[in-house]
Curated annotation (Swiss-Prot):
Gene Ontology CC terms: membrane
Identification of the protein by name: Phomopsin biosynthesis cluster protein B'
Domain of life: Eukaryota
Location of region: Disordered: 1-22, 118-186
Record's compositionally biased regions (Low complexity): 144-155
Subcellular location as annotated: Membrane
Source organism: Diaporthe leptostromiformis
Length: 342
C-alpha cells in the first residue's frame, strides 16, 4: 500500500487530467476528456511521460502493477465512451442539417400558394410568352357537338375566322370512362349533362349544377329548335324530345344563337362549383385551357358586336337605365384550392 501512495504522490509532469485543471478530466462528463485523443489523456507531448516516474518503483510490487493496470483500463473505457459520443453528436448534427434543408424546401414550395405570392404580370418570367389571345371569331373546337353551323356564323360575324384546329386533348387515346354508347354510359354510372351534350363520369358530373342551370336558362332540349340534319330540314319532333333529354341520340343541330355562349358559361359555372366544394376532378371539356380562353374571348366579342348596347341594358322600375359603378379596388390573392368564400 505504501507503493500505491508513492505512485499517487508522483509529480504531475505529464498528467493533465488531475488537479492542474479546474475540471476533472477523469470525469465521464468532461468534454475535455471526450474530445482529446487517448494518447493525451495522461501524456503531454512536450513533457516527459509520467510513466517515467514509475520506472523508479519496484515493478515487482503487485499493488503498484494492479493500480497501473486499472488506471489504463479506465482510460480505455473513457476513450470508448468518447468515440461513441463523437459518433452520436455527428449523427445528430447531420440529421438536424437534413431537417433544416427539408423545412426550407417545404417553405419555398408553399410560398407559391400563400396570399402574398400570387404571380402578377410583373413577377412572371420575361422569357415565358403569355398565352396567345384567340383571334376574333375563333371557331369553336370541333369536339363540341353543339357548335353553330357555317351559315349562322356568316350571318352573325363581321370578321374573318381562324379555323386552326385546337390542340389535342391530353390522353385522348385512353379508353373512355363512360364507354361509347348511351346504354354503356348508364351502366357505368355516368350522368348526362345537356349543356355539354355529353355523358360525364360520376366523379366530375355535378347534378346540382345541371339543375340550377336548367332553372336559370330553361330546358334546352325542349325549348330550343333542334334538327337532325345540318341543312335544318328535318326537325326533331316534340315526341322525340324525351330522347334528347335522356341523352339517347347520336347528333343534333340547332340554330339557336345563344347556345354557344350558354355552353361556355355552363363550363365556367362547373369550374367555380368545383373550387367552391373542393372537388378534385373536372370533365375534360371544361378543364381544357384552350376551351376556357376561347369562351372568354368569344363572349367578349359577341357583347362588343351588339349594334345597340341599350337594347341589352337593364332598366329599373321607372324605366331608367341601370348605372354600374366601378370604384378602384385592391384585391389580395387567395389559394386556388381554398373552399372559403373570399
Amino acid at each position: 500500500m505504501e507503493s500505491i501512495a508513492k505512485a499517487k504522490s508522483l509529480p504531475n509532469k505529464g498528467r493533465t487530467y488531475d488537479s492542474q485543471r479546474p475540471w476533472n478530466r477523469d470525469s465521464p462528463f468532461s468534454f475535455a476528456a471526450w474530445w482529446s485523443t487517448p494518447s493525451t489523456r495522461y501524456l503531454k507531448v512536450d513533457q516527459p511521460s509520467g510513466r517515467d516516474e514509475h520506472d523508479s518503483l519496484d515493478l515487482e510490487d503487485e499493488d503498484v502493477s494492479n493500480y497501473l493496470a486499472s488506471h489504463r483500463e479506465r482510460q480505455k473505457r473513457r476513450a470508448s465512451c468518447a468515440a461513441k459520443a463523437k459518433v452520436l453528436i455527428i449523427g445528430c448534427a447531420v440529421i438536424s442539417l437534413f431537417a433544416i434543408i427539408g423545412a426550407l424546401g417545404f417553405a419555398l414550395g408553399r410560398r407559391a400558394t400563400l396570399p402574398g405570392s400570387c404571380a402578377s404580370p410583373a413577377h412572371q418570367n420575361p422569357h415565358t410568352p403569355p398565352h396567345p389571345r384567340p383571334t376574333k371569331g375563333e371557331a369553336h373546337d370541333a369536339g363540341h357537338s353543339g357548335s353553330h353551323s357555317s351559315s349562322s356564323s356568316t350571318n352573325n360575324h363581321h370578321h374573318s375566322h381562324d379555323d386552326s384546329p385546337p390542340p389535342p386533348h391530353v390522353g385522348i387515346d385512353k379508353p373512355k370512362q363512360c364507354g361509347e354508347s348511351p346504354d354503356e354510359a348508364q351502366s357505368r354510372g355516368c350522368i348526362f349533362e345537356p349543356q355539354l351534350t355529353a355523358w360525364v363520369a360520376p366523379e366530375c358530373a355535378f347534378p346540382a349544377v345541371v339543375a340550377e342551370y336548367q332553372d336559370a336558362v330553361g330546358d334546352m332540349m325542349t325549348e330550343w329548335p333542334w334538327f337532325w340534319d345540318t341543312g335544318l330540314q328535318k326537325a326533331v319532333s316534340p315526341e322525340e324530345f324525351p330522347s334528347l333529354q335522356a341523352g339517347n341520340y347520336s347528333v343534333v343541330y340547332t340554330p339557336y344563337q345563344a347556345s354557344h355562349a350558354l355552353h361556355c358559361l355552363y363550363c365556367w359555372r362547373k369550374v367555380s362549383y368545383a373550387l367552391e366544394h373542393g372537388v378534385d376532378w373536372m370533365d375534360a371539356r371544361c378543364h381544357q385551357f384552350y376551351h376556357q380562353r376561347h369562351c372568354a374571348f368569344f363572349i367578349a366579342d359577341k357583347l362588343l358586336e351588339m349594334e345597340d348596347w341599350r337594347a341589352a341594358a337593364e332598366v329599373d322600375v321607372q324605366g331608367r337605365l341601370t348605372t354600374w359603378t366601378y370604384p378602384l379596388l385592391y384585391h389580395n390573392c387567395v389559394p386556388l384550392s381554398s373552399t372559403m368564400e373570399s
